[in-house]
């Protein structure tokens, strides 16, 4: 009698969906509120000079921290409940809705979510005209053999945009156009994420003049605005080279063997779409579409740099672009476009953004569980912030500088706004640095590196999730690639921060 052994199929561990990860983080965050008491800082106004103008910012008073107590003198806790009603603090089951509807039109979550839907719809119209697909085919035909040059050219331009004017959300719009180009060139949509949004964040983090990060942090820390630019420019060059080389190596591997791409299946959308595209002569209508598209991009950059336009204005600019291009498409019958297909294209483009928009709202809800992240608000976050600051105070100055970098990187998971994080952390860490011998310029370096580079992998980064959404890249597929690049940049950041402290950078 022979024994028959049945082989059981091996179960491979699969990375949980991003929503599952966020919900698990929400549970851990809720549990923390049961053991960590609520703390509070008083807020104060600080002034700093930018381009000859006096700016003000609401920040915490580092000497005012206190644990809130009840009438019996015992520490007060804002323990997250399972479910709450009315204007009570959100419970665990409330955090998705509260996160999705929080904020204003100027930021996370509702402002960013509406921004994503509007630009998704606007570019849905642009792509429906067929001009972009037709232009990509023509571009490839005229640059055959030199395709690899697109990657360094785009990467450097986007990194420069992040360094000079804090480019971030704007990269989403460019990614919509560049994604089909990269796939057509034999790369993948992860390459698009790298050359657009990730490049902007490398520039953002290593900038010498970013108005939303380094300028605000220097102003709050009492360091002359735009000082220390020499080292920062060198760091920007090094960081950009690291990111560019990483991207070139990754893109080359994917081009040689497309099956190595983690998004080979999801990129089928772009490949199938391209298979249906037939090369046709460029018409006058196509040229009008490209002229309007280029003009709006210039208009957006001008508005951000000159007038400090932000989410509401940029979204309205892209809506204007979509409307005008849609009218051109209807008038010139581009790709058989009608008024009805113009409307359905807007809806389809917006629909593509729903999944990443949900992630943005859910991530914001996590912050609401521990406090709103605003200077002067009572929250668990303040207690954690003060405790970590006290722990750093007992370290050697070079080690303390490195721990400031690490702390800023972790803290950025909860407060992804560069200026918001500066308002919460710099008033504490700048004077703390004085006590342990860390130069304030180094403290600012630790802040900008920790704040900027960690945007590469945090699902709480609205712009990252939006870029992944338009490129149809699942966060789980992005995480391994992004974490590897972040590791390289964190090593560089650590060397720079410790080296700057030891060399007396100021």
Curated annotation (Swiss-Prot):
GO CC, one annotated term: plasma membrane
Family: To H.influenzae HI_0594.
PANTHER family hit by this protein: BASIC AMINO ACID ANTIPORTER YFCC-RELATED
Keyword Cell inner membrane: yes
Subcellular location: Cell inner membrane
Organism: Escherichia coli (strain K12)
GO molecular function, one term: antiporter activity
Mode of membrane association: Multi-pass membrane protein
Protein name: Putative basic amino acid antiporter YfcC
Function field: Metabolomic profiling of different yfcC over-expression and deletion strains suggests that it may affect the glyoxylate shunt.
Keyword Acyltransferase: no
Pfam families with a match to the protein in the record: DcuC (PF03606)
InterPro entries from the UniProt entry: C4_dicarb_anaerob_car-like, DASS-Related_Transporters
Listed transmembrane segments: 19-39, 107-127, 148-168, 171-191, 208-228, 231-251, 287-307, 310-330, 352-372, 398-418, 419-439, 442-462, 485-505
Lineage top rank: taxon: Bacteria
UniProtKB keywords: Antiport, Cell inner membrane, Cell membrane, Membrane, Transmembrane, Transmembrane helix, Transport
């Amino acid at each position: 009698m022979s024994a028959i052994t049945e082989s059981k199929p091996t179960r491979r561990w699969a990375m949980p969906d991003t929503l599952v990860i966020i919900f698990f983080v929400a549970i851990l965050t809720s549990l923390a509120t049961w053991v960590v008491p609520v703390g509070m800082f008083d807020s104060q106004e600080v002034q700093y000079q930018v381009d000859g103008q006096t700016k003000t910012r609401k920040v915490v008073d580092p000497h005012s921290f206190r644990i809130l107590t009840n009438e019996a003198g015992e520490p007060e806790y804002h323990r997250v409940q399972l479910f709450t009603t009315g204007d009570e603090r959100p419970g665990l089951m409330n955090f998705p809705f509260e996160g999705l509807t929080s904020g204003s039109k100027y930021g996370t979550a509702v402002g960013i979510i509406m921004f994503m839907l509007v630009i998704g719809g606007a570019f849905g119209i642009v792509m429906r005209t067929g001009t972009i697909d037709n232009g990509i085919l023509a571009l490839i035909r005229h640059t055959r053999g030199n395709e690899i040059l697109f990657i360094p050219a785009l990467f450097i331009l986007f990194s420069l945009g992040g360094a000079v004017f804090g480019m971030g959300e704007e990269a989403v719009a460019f990614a919509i156009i560049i994604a089909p180009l990269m796939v057509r060139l034999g790369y993948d949509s992860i390459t698009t994420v790298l050359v657009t949004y990730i490049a902007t964040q490398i520039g953002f983090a290593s900038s010498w003049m970013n108005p939303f990060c380094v300028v605000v942090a220097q102003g709050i820390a009492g360091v002359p605005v735009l000082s220390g630019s020499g080292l920062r420019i060198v760091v920007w060059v090094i960081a950009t080279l690291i990111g560019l080389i990483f991207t070139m190596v990754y893109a080359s591997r994917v081009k040689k063997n497309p099956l190595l791409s983690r998004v080979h299946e999801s990129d089928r959308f772009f490949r199938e779409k391209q298979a249906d595209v037939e090369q046709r002569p460029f018409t006058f209508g196509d040229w009008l579409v490209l002229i309007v598209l280029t003009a709006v991009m210039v208009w957006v950059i001008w508005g951000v740099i000159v007038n400090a336009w932000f989410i509401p204005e940029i979204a309205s600019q892209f809506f204007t672009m979509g409307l005008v291009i849609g009218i051109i498409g209807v008038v010139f019958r581009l790709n058989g476009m009608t008024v009805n297909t113009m409307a359905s294209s807007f809806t389809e483009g917006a629909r593509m953004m729903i999944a990443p928009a949900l992630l943005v709202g859910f991530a914001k809800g996590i912050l609401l569980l521990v406090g709103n992240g605003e200077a002067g608000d009572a929250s668990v976050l303040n207690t954690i912030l003060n405790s970590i600051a006290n722990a750093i105070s007992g370290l050697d100055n070079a080690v303390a500088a490195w721990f400031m970098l690490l702390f800023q990187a972790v803290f950025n998971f909860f407060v992804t706004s560069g200026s918001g994080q500066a308002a919460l952390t710099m008033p504490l860490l700048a004077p703390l640095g004085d006590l342990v011998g860390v130069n304030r310029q180094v403290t600012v370096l630790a802040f900008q590196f920790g704040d900027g580079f960690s945007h590469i992998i945090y699902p709480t980064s609205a712009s990252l999730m939006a870029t992944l959404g338009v490129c149809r890249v699942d966060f789980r597929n992005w995480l391994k690639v992004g974490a590897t690049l972040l590791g390289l940049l964190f090593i560089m950041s650590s060397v720079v921060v410790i080296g700057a402290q030891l060399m007396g950078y100021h």
